[in-house]
């Protein structure tokens, strides 16, 4: 029987605690000179922005009535690492599917960009708890190509484990233990079933624990209605916050835009469409517009009502990536001969992406710097996130989209 690669791509964003900071704003937060402007960062951010939106639109095409949550960074990292061992059309499809222009960007620069991104995300000195991990699980009688192994370790910080896939329960435990440890127990059963021909598995995770500089006050949280659609309403715990916030209305998107900063180097962008404008928002949203929001912040007195929620996403990447042009790797025409020294052809038989996000009131106070700002004497806007909305969480040094999601029903986990 022809061996095949079974690849489980696994992601976690665990205990994502949104803590708004309207009293602890630092002038440097709007100073773009503080951002990492290296070519590697710029390159990866540009491509990941395009990739994230393309992937999101494909998910909407598959189902526009459910919550969406995924990590463009996690998915792109795993496929980019796999490209190290691919050749021919398989290789080209992967990198072009990740939105890289191979006539303008060398393969070496692509992998250096990912290396720089992972080093930035895994900085131990950051206030933001953000870590990633890549695990290569190799059948004990399979020998990997040394060049692939060295580059996977060097560029993608990959850990290598020798396992016996003939003992599927034992192999699952090794993979699941790796992910469970890396995600601090948030994903305990990442792999439920392995294909019988599996000889190689790749697991990627990302753990994100974000706290706002100033938390919501739980005493202000009250039960309120959330309108899933025109005929469906659910009850949710609705958090409330008032103060000087980065909020404005974007006529291009027909949506309200809210930016909220984490302690550390991450920002969440929330997009609340006007009535009946969700489809317009999804069709019009672009990485250029998001970049403008991040660079040109507008603070004003405002009040927001935001649902406490916990959502997750689990996706079959074969059906998700194929419309983006990544098809060869999943069929018998795949060329992954740069991974193993064996002559038997390999293909990607399984590709799974999992993500979890929690938003609640908890968080930590930052050293407060009181900022007084004159504002026009007009009625402050009241934003009620009581109908479906989008959000994107960015790492600020690289301007890379870590997570992208859509909340349709905050009660559906």
Swiss-Prot record:
Main localization (coarse): secreted
Single Gene Ontology MF annotation: serine-type endopeptidase inhibitor activity
Domain of life, source organism: Eukaryota
UniProt xrefs under Pfam families: Serpin
One GO CC term, this protein: extracellular region
Region (RCL): 368-387
Known glycosylation sites: 64, 101, 265
Residues annotated as site: Reactive bond: 377-378
One Gene Ontology term from the biological process aspect of the record: response to cytokine
Subcellular location: Secreted
Function description: Inhibitor of serine proteases. Its primary target is elastase, but it also has a moderate affinity for plasmin and thrombin.
Family from the record: Belongs to the serpin family.
Further information: Murine alpha-1-antitrypsin is represented by a cluster of up to 6 individual Serpina1-related genes. The precise complement of Serpina1-related genes present varies according to the strain of the animal.
Protein name as annotated: Alpha-1-antitrypsin 1-1
Organism annotation: Mus musculus
UniProt gene name: Serpina1a
